Amino acid sequence: MRIADYSVTKAVLERHGFTFKKSFGQNFLTDTNILQKIVDTAEIDDQVNVIEIGPGIGALTEFLAERAAQVMAFEIDHRLVPILADTLRDFDNVTVVNEDILKVDLAQHIQNFKNPDLPIKVVANLPYYITTPILMHLIESGIPFCEFVVMMQKEVADRISAQPNTKAYGSLSIAVQYYMTAKVAFIVPRTVFVPAPNVDSAILKMVRRPEPAVAVEDENFFFKVSKASFTHRRKTLWNNLTGYFGKTEEVKDKLTKALDQAGLSPSVRGEALSLAEFAGLADALKGQGL
């Protein structure tokens, strides 16, 4: 029997008198086939260390611990710590850290792996209400995670993996794809969770690029420009950028020159631009002193 078997999950929750906290976005997976697929998608073996976020009662952790060198699981809910100590008692390669992943000194914790030089993968069922902040925090942490295989709301997975000229494409697509390749591995129906969420989920596989997707003079400025370009999706690049930089004649003159230099029409919308085109635009705007 597995932790994720519905009868086991139910028994564990009842034994410990556990009640779900909506504020933590807790939805526990009760489908062993899907858990197996997640671990297979992540290609976990004994030459990999794993960071897990939000282990719950250890359903995914169990599958990870059977294959990984070590698993470090970050759980914000202190009520789950004794439950995890119970459900994962047979594993000596799991460490549960009762901390908020957004506040913890992750670099310090990673040194506690027995072999911190092994590649590190992030495999997690992320809380829906805080998926994007957690992902961006980890991607921008400077820690060389080689891969992420994470469950999230399907709509967010679609946005992250979206290509130009699609409805889902936006500043989040650019922010993630600058660092990683991103592809939806498979869809997870809402019916396999306790309690069932209101939406379907997706497993997103992201692999770190050896170098960022495009070369830019100023990364922060590049992200600001891409974000500003999507402020109002239905507006043109010109309208969004004058809304961001200002509408003085000087700004308009510089903006005209930058767009011309980048080979872009003022009437194009942000969703039509590739990462390379955003890079060219950001560098041209920077060159104009904007």
From Swiss-Prot:
Where does it live in the cell?
Cytoplasm
Under catalytic activity, the entry for this protein gives:
adenosine(1518)/adenosine(1519) in 16S rRNA + 4 S-adenosyl-L-methionine = N(6)-dimethyladenosine(1518)/N(6)-dimethyladenosine(1519) in 16S rRNA + 4 S-adenosyl-L-homocysteine + 4 H(+)
* Annotated binding of S-adenosyl-L-methionine, by residue: 27, 29, 54, 75, 100, 125
Keywords in alphabetical order: Cytoplasm, Methyltransferase, RNA-binding, rRNA processing, S-adenosyl-L-methionine, Transferase
Per the UniProt record, which EC number(s) apply here? 2.1.1.182
* Alphabetical list of Gene3D superfamilies matching this protein: Ribosomal RNA adenine dimethylase-like, domain 2, Vaccinia Virus protein VP39
Disulfide feature: none
Superkingdom is: Bacteria
Q: What class of enzyme is it?
A: transferase
Major localization listed first in the record, in broad terms: cytoplasm
Q: Which GO terms describe its molecular function?
A: 16S rRNA (adenine(1518)-N(6)/adenine(1519)-N(6))-dimethyltransferase activity; RNA binding
What is one cellular component GO term in this UniProt entry?
Answer: cytosol
What's this protein's function?
Specifically dimethylates two adjacent adenosines (A1518 and A1519) in the loop of a conserved hairpin near the 3'-end of 16S rRNA in the 30S particle. May play a critical role in biogenesis of 30S subunits.
Q: Which family does it belong to?
A: Belongs to the class I-like SAM-binding methyltransferase superfamily. rRNA adenine N(6)-methyltransferase family. RsmA subfamily.
Q: Which HAMAP family match?
A: 16SrRNA_methyltr_A (MF_00607)
> What is the recorded name of this protein?
Ribosomal RNA small subunit methyltransferase A
**Organism field:** Streptococcus pneumoniae serotype 4 (strain ATCC BAA-334 / TIGR4)
Give the gene name.
rsmA
